[in-house]
Amino acid sequence: MSTIVIAVIALAALAAVFGAILGFASIRFKVEADPIVDQIDAILPQTQCGQCGYPGCRPYAEAIANGDAINKCPPGGQATIEKLADLMGVEVQDSAHDLDNKVKMVAFIHEDMCIGCTKCIQACPVDAIVGGNKAVHTVIKNECTGCDLCVAPCPTDCIEMIPVQTTPESWKWQLNAIPVVNVTDSAPAAQKSAN
């Protein structure tokens, strides 16, 4: 037999042996994940922004499973808090970040100051910044979560957080500001005072 055929057979045999060892090890040493952590992680928005105080959504999901508050995720908003409360069987909590009264902010890059270093692109957890090396970068406003992680790495301080302009889509009615009077409760009192 030729040396090439012997080498191919030897490599194939080694690959089969090591593949079998890896297959056995993956079954034997498999670590079961907590299913509740997986369910919580599926509800979280996966922005990995760190606004909750944890380095990403998975560590925050593990903390929630261990009893931490469910109201620390600004990108998820009130809808995420309600889903987490339903899953965990706890009361719906108000947001820890006062999301209803907080103005949504997005990153804005002053393009005349941008040097194209890509540090902001690397820091953005949701890929809301586009641009290339040594080229001007810009922010996709609809994708930006306002996490503020892109501001610190910028060497020229050309990124600032600006409030999102109010549009018909982002308008929030303050329905609790309108007082509601129950007419049926006030009618007997008015009749008693007339008598």
From Swiss-Prot:
Signal sequence extent: none
Enzyme class: translocase
Periplasmic side: 1-3
Organism whose genome encodes this protein: Vibrio cholerae serotype O1 (strain ATCC 39541 / Classical Ogawa 395 / O395)
Record-listed [4Fe-4S] cluster 3 binding positions: 124, 144, 147, 150
Residue spans, topological domain Cytoplasmic: 25-195
CC per GO annotation: plasma membrane
Protein name: Ion-translocating oxidoreductase complex subunit B
Family of the protein in this entry: Belongs to the 4Fe4S bacterial-type ferredoxin family. RnfB subfamily.
SUPFAM superfamilies per record: 4Fe-4S ferredoxins
Database matches in NCBIfam families: PRK05113.1 (NF003475), rnfB (TIGR01944)
Boundaries of every 4Fe-4S domain copy: 32-90
Molecular function in Gene Ontology: 4 iron, 4 sulfur cluster binding; electron transfer activity; metal ion binding
Cofactor: [4Fe-4S] cluster
Gene assigned in the entry: rnfB
Keywords of this entry: 4Fe-4S, Cell inner membrane, Cell membrane, Electron transport, Iron, Iron-sulfur, Membrane, Metal-binding, Repeat, Translocase, Transmembrane, Transmembrane helix, Transport
